Amino acid sequence: NLLVLGGGSNMLLTKDVDALVLQINLRGISVISSFENSVHIEVAAGENWHELVCWCLNKDFGGLENLSLIPGNVGTAPIQNIGAYGVELKDVFLDCNTLSIKDQSEKKFTKEECKFAYRNSIFKHQKKGKYIADFFLFSYFCTPFLKINL
């Protein structure tokens, strides 16, 4: 048995866990490509989500400003396609690199393969418990992009 944790911020254990507990603690944020109006950023699954949003804002990269203060780590964000105020993870998601729990092979999932929907993805159902994500590729605007619902 394996229990994979992100940051553990929404876990409440009421009894002993009869499993190997694996907490993803991979760190790293780096710009891997720059274009005229956007940048591609690789982010490790163990990075704190809100800290990633702040890092991007400090560099004037836009796209996920509305998703600040969402608890948890980057690695768990695609499971339910986190979102707030008209913006969702899928709006900046390009792909993620994963490791198969069954045979430890690597597999890259594109945005299309993740089948993002409202608070949903392939990792919440068909691929639940089958892969561990380690790195993500996101595309951000070179200036903040405000989406304000009035």
Language-model regions: role of each:
Residues 11, 106-150:
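Phosphate/pyrophosphate- and phosphate-bearing ligand-binding catalytic cores of soluble enzymes
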Residues 36, 62, 94, 139-142, ...:
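Compositionally biased, low-structure terminal segments
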Residues 45, 68, 83, 94-100, ...:
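Short, structured patches in soluble enzyme cores that scaffold and shape functional sites
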